Structure formats: structure tokens, C-alpha cells
């Protein structure tokens, strides 16, 4: 076999593996809600809880209360929070510093106010009136109501405390006290239903972003994904997560059960009140970016307002297999950004640095290919002489390589060894929160976390799932074709049908695979192609 063609096939096999990796990663992320889990189940026995039929009987009054309810808007340095006097719950939580595609604050709560609340508590179904609101100070806000159960009257208070340091965390305290002279509650537990519907997206955003919504849980020092029927005792936290944002809940001595209702997976926080005279439960809710700069401050007591430590919210940021390679890459990107505050340029500079570092491998591979090319006449003679004896041909080929001091895999291995670097760069560019909303070229590449756009259709094209006309995929395709031609020593006129497909078909195939990929990734790919073209010209001049 022509050795140059073997090298070319190795290159395209590597590219195929890259495309397959990205396709699988995209499919997995889009369907992560159904990910399997090998979690252990911790059984618990709660013999008596609220009667579901009793709770449903009071729902008829809900619609009247919703119509009479009042919205309470609380603004902090980072949040615009909207509460409702109906159930005293959050109905909107906007992040002032993180804008959506429409350049409005991102709303982390995505619920239908008529049918669901974000933090649904069992006691809410017994309250047949609106909650009373009290502003204690700028950071503390209280909602109070009363309810009766089995002839007994209870005072029911929800208190929200925001961080004084503008951290993406609030304290949520539930207090229930009996107002009459009796000892213990006559129920064993109450539940909090934690909605998985987070991050409200516009129609345009739904077309641009894949559905990365998932229920996650951290226990036994591992991040796991929730699944229907899973029960866990005392996890460190549970939460709902999208690609870039998360809402995470932590509580001491928490029991959690995951259930699927009407096609949506929800987490039920079960709180044991057996043998208690009153209830005073404290929850800490992180609601913000999946960015370790904000998440890790709750691991050290002195770093946060609430004195929390070892919460490990930072584990909600999924770590890829190539994490150890990603860390220094991100540090290099940050250095470039500190000098020139443009993440697109940081990606370009990082790519150049990486290509320079792996240049010895590239040079070695090209030199091995050149050495093999010199042996082509002798190899053809052997192929003609032993064309009917494959075993003898392999022996003679091996002897020829040994005599000439040539490694037939010398041109392939450098290509394969570069794959982990690409995979690490892909994971970094595809998931780095700092690239969300980061503009490279205003009016064209406005957000490095999604594809570039010069025209938005407003719908998906049926056969190719395109939502926009994009320029970067075309540039990528032509530069990929150019780098392949320059990297090869073959005469294009003498190519067979198979080789022509490798040359011209593969770049076209990758055009479709990468069309909707984040523009940050395509900038990396294009920079790599251009660098490869210049690099190969230099190598050919040097070797000649």
C-alpha cells in the first residue's frame, strides 16, 4: 500500500474519531436526563405522612388565591427575585450579571405559576389564604401564614436570607409551630418538591441551546444523575442543572427520592419530624452559574457570608476525562485574556501555543513520511515480486524497514498522540462558562458558546437541523481541505475514487457535523488548519 495514503487514512481516521466523539458527546448531553446511575439505594420507612387525598381537596381554592396574590420584588447586587404571596414562594429569580440571547437577565425559574411552584412544600396545601409579607431588612424577607390540621392551628413561616457579599446563595428557613398546648406533631414527615424546571429560555434560545437539563445529586464524594425511583439518605446536596447554570440545595440530614411525574423527573426532599414539638429546617440554595469561581467559596468557612464549609457545590461542574490537560490550557487562556480581554483571541493564541508545543511530534511524523516516500520504488518492486505470497511480502517489507532504519508507523503515531489534546480543547471550549455570551466579532460572532450567525431562520430546517446561516463552518471546511492537501505528498491527478473521497468527502462530512457547534470550537479548528498549512510549508522547505 502506498505509505502516503496510509498516513492520510490515519489522519482521517483520527478526524473521524474526533467527529464521533463530538457527536456522542452532543447526544449524551442532550439526553443526560435519562442517564443511568449505579447509585446504591438507601431505604427509609416513613409510615405516616400527609394524606395526598387531603392535600388535593384544598387545591380548588388555589386559583382564587393566585388571582388575588401580590408579587413582591426584591433586588440585590446580583439578583432580581420575585416572590408571590400565594404560597410565599419564588416565582422568578433573574441574574443581573448574566444576560440571555435577548440581552435580558437570565431567569433561573421556569415554571407555570398556575400549576406549579418552584419549591413546593406539603404545608402549602393546608394554607387557605395568602401569606403575609414582612421585610426585615434588605437581606431578610419573611412570609407568614396559618393553617389547621386535625383541629390544630399552626403558624407557618418561610424566611429568605440573601448574602451580604453578593454570593449566589440564599438561606431558606421553614418554621412551623403549634399555637395550642399540645406536645408532638401527629404526622411523621413533610415533603418539599424541588422543581427541575430551571432557566427560562426564549424560542430562539431553545433552537440555539441543546437541552442539557438534568437532575443531579452529590453523595459518597461522587456526582451522580437522578433517576426515577432512586432514594438516597443524607446526600451533600441535590440540584437541577443546565449546561451553564445550576440550582443546588443543601441541608443537613436530608433524605431524597426521585420520581417522574407527567414525564418530568422531580426530587422530593423528605424531612422527618417524628417526635418533634416544632419544625425549624434550614436549607441553603445556590442559584447561579456553574463556575467554580462562585461555587467553591462555600468550601471554606471564612470565604462566605453563611460560614458554610465543605459543601462541594463545585462538583456540579462536570469534569471530562481530559480534565488534567484542560486545567493548564484554561490557565493559559486566562493569561491571554488578562492581556487582551477577548476570549476569541485567547482561543487563537492558546491554539498557536499548543501547536508550537506539539511541533516536534508533527515534524517527526512528516519526516517519517518523507523517509517512507523515498522507499516507494523498492516497496513497489517487492509488491510486484511477492504479490502472490502475502506472508513473504510482509517479511521482506519488515527487512527493508529494518535495513533502512525506517519506522512504518512513524507518521501515524504523532497524529494519534495529538488526539487527547484535541479532546481536552474541545471539552474546554464547549463547556467553559466564561465563553457564554462572550463576543469575538460583534454582529457576527456574538457568543462563543453557540454557533455564529449572519441570518436566523426562526425554525429548524428539517433535514439538517440548521437554525441559522453560519460562515465559520464554510471557512473550516475550506481550510481543512487546504491543510490536508498541503500535508500530503500525493499527486491529486492519480487519486482513485476512495482517495478522492478521503480528500474531498471528509471535509464536507465534517462541515455538517460541526455546523451547529460552538463558534469557539470552530475558531480553534480553523486556527489549527491555518497553522498546519503554514507549518507544512515550513517543514517541506526545511526537509528539501
From Swiss-Prot:
Give membrane topology per the record: Multi-pass membrane protein
| Gene Ontology CC terms | plasma membrane
Set out the biological process GO terms recorded for this chain's protein. protein insertion into membrane; protein transport
Query: Any stretches that span the bilayer, and where are they?
Result: 13-33, 343-363, 409-429, 461-481, 506-526
- Which UniProt keywords are given for this protein, alphabetically ordered? Cell inner membrane, Cell membrane, Chaperone, Membrane, Protein transport, Transmembrane, Transmembrane helix, Transport
Does the entry feature the keyword Calcium, yes or no?
no
Which InterPro entries does UniProt cross-reference here? Answer: Membr_insert_YidC (IPR019998), YidC/ALB3/OXA1/COX18 (IPR001708), YidC/Oxa/ALB_C (IPR028055), YidC_ALB_C (IPR047196), YidC_periplasmic_sf (IPR038221)
Pfam name, any one: 60KD_IMP
Q: Which GO terms describe its molecular function?
A: membrane insertase activity
Localisation per UniProt entry: Cell inner membrane
Q: Which family does it belong to?
A: Belongs to the OXA1/ALB3/YidC family. Type 1 subfamily.
Q: Which HAMAP family match?
A: YidC_type1
* Role of this protein: Required for the insertion and/or proper folding and/or complex formation of integral membrane proteins into the membrane. Involved in integration of membrane proteins that insert both dependently and independently of the Sec translocase complex, as well as at least some lipoproteins. Aids folding of multispanning membrane proteins.
Quaternary structure per UniProt? Answer: Interacts with the Sec translocase complex via SecD. Specifically interacts with transmembrane segments of nascent integral membrane proteins during membrane integration.
Name this polypeptide is given: Membrane protein insertase YidC
What species was this sequence derived from?
Borreliella burgdorferi (strain ATCC 35210 / DSM 4680 / CIP 102532 / B31)
